[in-house]
Amino acid sequence: MLTGQHHIPGIESPLMVVLWRVAAGVFLPLVPTMAVFGNVLVILSVYRERNLQTVTNMLIVSLAVSDLFVAIGVMSFGVYYEWNGFKWGLGSFFCHVYQALDVACSTASILNLLAISLDRYIAIGHPISYAQYGARGGRAMISITIVWGVSCAVALPLLLGVNPMENDQCELANPWFNMISSIFSFFIPCIAMIILYTIIFRRLRQRERARSLRQAQRSETDKISSALLGGAQIARQMGKHFKNRTDQILLEISFQTSSFPTISESSDDGSTISPMINSFNNFLPKKSQYPSTLIPAIPECGSMPNLTIIERPAPPEKEKDIELSIMDLHDTVEMLDDKYTSAMITRSFGEELEEILPFIDGSTSVKNSREQLHATRSNTSTTRLLDVKPELRSISVPSIQDEKKMNSRPPENPFAHQNGTNKQRLLPNPGILMKSKSTTLLKTNGYLDTDSLNNNRNSHKKSTADLLPNDDYSFTDSMRVYKNRLFKSLSRATSGWNKPRPSRHMVKKATKQMRREHKATVTLAVVLAVFLFCWLPFFILHLSNSICLVIDSNSDCIGFLPLYLATWLGYLNSSLNPLIYTVFDQRFRNAFRNILSCGFFKKR
């Protein structure tokens, strides 16, 4: 039963007593009501919303339970004690229960905040370990069990009568118990939490700096990679164009000792070649004057897959003119060689690509082609004509890439590749066709013996071996060498980029999770700051008063009113935590709104 006494310790003025009573009658019941309402919302939100059922939120539920016990079991007795004029009329048992609940719930709140701080430290400082072991409900239950076990152990001496009640005053009057409990249940956990949150925010700051640095490096890396990959793409495209163009040009210069260059219908620069070749058309015999013999197609393993050769013997009176035409043709081919190798190839692909030209078409290169041209011209100028009739050939060579047809009907050079020591005998064996590994076909309508044929082949192999490496490379192989060299340089420039990159979904999920962890850390830091603001004055005054009483038990160190106000400031913290969650956490805010609206917003 409330006594209604107007005497308040520390207040002597009647006016102040009246104001105190009015404020206490309005304010004191409001604090526990808000605490019960808010913490029940927190518990229901985590219970109802699956996305809130995390380890951190389970610890928050434990904190809400301790605040709920403070509101129900501690604040209610505090309101009664104040309304009864600070006289305890419920007996010593309830006084001990009241004091034990006060100490246990306050200690549980502090230890729950410490457990949350440890959870935040592991989540921010060691995210991989947290993802593997920390984000489990079992660990949260172990932490909660330890928190409440320690809290009950700290409050157990009060139930055993360590703090006896005197003169109807239910207060914590044992100074030694007050000092020990304050140090171990508040100050040590507070120091640990401050250290942990300092490390956490330092890690967050370092992570933000590293993220900014990665973004800056990523922009530069993207520019470099775009340039390199773009260059590789351009090189591949130019390589295709170069292959098509080289197939046509090398077809012209490959017949330097056996026939005129062909007039390619698929040439990209026909206007350049045609005027040079047309000057020799006057020496060609008419198509209808001589019979032709069709030789079956010859499969070729290189840049020319098949050839169709048509023989047309030339009249004897044209032999001299054909020889002179061939001599002039070497100058034309040499000019074409200079034009398309040094000008176009070097300009398009750089000097590095010239190293690959020895592998193009199996047996020709820029330098060696020129040497062969000069050597052939010298040989043709000093060698007399044999009594072998020249012939005309019509060669149809499908292109490898675009399968365009290239046809020509120029007269053939009557001189095949010869070794200086070869001796020729005239035997009636016409139509012998020799095929080399390159695109040059050696064809004579004369007479060769077996030794001459073998020597010719051996000399060709020997000359080819000087031009080629150990293996025969087609144009595709040479371009593959260039591509491998290019991508090796790219791999050196982009070392470290070949690590497997996570999918966009995983990156997005990880980014979202990190933002959520950051927001949760900020929210809990605010909770810790508010907790320290509410409870630190009480424990400082409480510890100071206990030390003072230990030194001098008869002195009145700190008055009743400051301790009473500091106690209710600590109780106020239990009703502020749900407000903090509502302001700083969108998920809790949505959950509160769904509960208060009976799920109306969630259904919509």
UniProtKB/Swiss-Prot annotation:
Residues 399-430 are annotated as: Disordered. It is found in: Cell membrane. Pfam families: 7tm_1. The keyword Transmembrane applies. Residues 45-58, 118-141, 201-520, 581-604 are cytoplasmic. It comes from the Eukaryota. The chain crosses the membrane at residues 24-44, 59-79, 97-117, 142-162, 180-200, 521-541, 560-580. InterPro entries: GPCR_Rhodpsn (IPR000276), GPCR_Rhodpsn_7TM (IPR017452). Keywords: Cell membrane, Disulfide bond, G-protein coupled receptor, Membrane, Receptor, Transducer, Transmembrane, Transmembrane helix. PROSITE patterns: G_PROTEIN_RECEP_F1_1, G_PROTEIN_RECEP_F1_2. Belongs to the G-protein coupled receptor 1 family. This is Dopamine receptor 3.
